[in-house]
Amino acid sequence: MEVAANCSLRVKRPLLDPRFEGYKLSLEPLPCYQLELDAAVAEVKLRDDQYTLEHMHAFGMYNYLHCDSWYQDSVYYIDTLGRIMNLTVMLDTALGKPREVFRLPTDLTACDNRLCASIHFSSSTWVTLSDGTGRLYVIGTGERGNSASEKWEIMFNEELGDPFIIIHSISLLNAEEHSIATLLLRIEKEELDMKGSGFYVSLEWVTISKKNQDNKKYEIIKRDILRGKSVPHYAAIEPDGNGLMIVSYKSLTFVQAGQDLEENMDEDISEKIKEPLYYWQQTEDDLTVTIRLPEDSTKEDIQIQFLPDHINIVLKDHQFLEGKLYSSIDHESSTWIIKESNSLEISLIKKNEGLTWPELVIGDKQGELIRDSAQCAAIAERLMHLTSEELNPNPDKEKPPCNAQELEECDIFFEESSSLCRFDGNTLKTTHVVNLGSNQYLFSVIVDPKEMPCFCLRHDVDALLWQPHSSKQDDMWEHIATFNALGYVQASKRDKKFFACAPNYSYAALCECLRRVFIYRQPAPMSTVLYNRKEGRQVGQVAKQQVASLETNDPILGFQATNERLFVLTTKNLFLIKVNTEN
């Protein structure tokens, strides 16, 4: 069995600035333009049954504004009329109204459990689109932005099950066929999950293809599914379609894929076996066994036989648990009851009071013993002489090396540790793994549309931008830019909603849920002489911070950055902030 290579991200030292002195607040005005929308943005709020943190990450914080990275300063959104609206900026002072480029053929409001409609630009002439009801569209657009050749035409249209959003897609063209590969994200209910949230994350990799020599329609040729317990921070298909890269807090694994299906089913079965069949706890006098019952169970479905050193439990004519008990019980005083939480509670009275049972039924490993805090403390006290001869062998342990009260919230490391994984598209096995440790994921950005999206991670106080290169097996992730101290600065923005940067790295920006936008520029040469009095030296460069406050009380729904402009979307308006004047 092949083991995935354990890799690390190599930081380029020349891109770091250890002498960075921070951002200087600039009061220079930022030109801001406002466009009123003909129809409101098709926002879909979370339902009552979408209550988990993963629902919030995937759908509650969804970016409703989409940037076409193949064409400069071109953004799209979907309104309540089912129209895909486009705004392409040529001149800030002569802004036109957003124009309709396509209209969804289905009524968005007809589906009760729909998600937000999503769109992804696979290439300069292809688009993937989801209406939020579970239907996937592949659309040929012609050359977007060219009125003579642009025409949005549905080339593939199929229902793919439960509603999903599109995470990423690519277009693959060779002499024999044209393919579109796309990633679809769902959060689905898991009935067997008793202890977790009751949901799991599903990431489906779908490939749609058409042979060039045939006149056949586009059809699905491959569907693979990954499952996990957390929404991926980042997921993208490699440009050649041979692999997949994912950044996530909890790992995702393939569960349905041709030759590996049987193997994965065996893994799933073994996982289910590991789940405790019952839970039990004990005191000095008795034992309590708790069993989760199937739905609609009644007293008539339960048969329990107590013997002095034996127990037999039958549920709905099926043997549930049978065997010799670890020690004797008072079988005449033992009882059972059905609780309101649809669970069966069995009370066993010990014959030998004070005896601690290490197991309930001899040789049975299907149950889990739950210890209370008093028992744990008593056991620890009895074992103390085995671990230390002194009550306090390390008296300095209580004296931390620094005063925790002096630490700011953004100094504290995150408990969660994400990982970056690369999956092979043919074997569906993990080939490379990077443990990101405390390198917090911040955002992703498309620098070159022909390459995979970049992702930005916090490294100490800085924010480092990484470009994946699937063709370089030994050095898959390149450090291409650094935003000085931005990892530290963003941590203090507790109301931040979206994070972005310019494709040319000239600035990074984040917005809060309401109104305010913060812009952090890269250090630039000074036009005047400035001295650092403490060090008695001339300062050559200064990094500026600017703040824009939008004239609206509506929450921000979308946020995109280009080299020259920031686009901010609310329910009724689209704002343009001119950040850079240089072309």
From Swiss-Prot:
Residues 273-361 form the CS domain. Isoform 1 is the dominant immunogenic isoform and is capable of eliciting a humoral response in individuals with a variety of solid tumors. Expression of isoform 1 in a wide variety of malignancies as well as the presence of an immunogenic epitope suggest that it may be a suitable target for antigen-specific immunotherapy. One of its GO terms (biological process) is immune system process. The keyword Nuclease does not apply. CDD domains: p23_NUDCD1_like. It holds the Pfam family CS. Isoform 1 is specifically expressed in leukemias and a variety of solid tumor cell lines and is also detected in testis and heart. Isoform 2 is predominantly expressed in testis and weakly expressed in tumor cells. GO terms for cellular component: cytosol; nucleoplasm. The modification Phosphoserine is found at residues 8, 388. This is NudC domain-containing protein 1. InterPro entries: CS_dom, HSP20-like_chaperone, NUDCD1. Keywords: Cytoplasm, Immunity, Nucleus, Phosphoprotein, Tumor antigen.
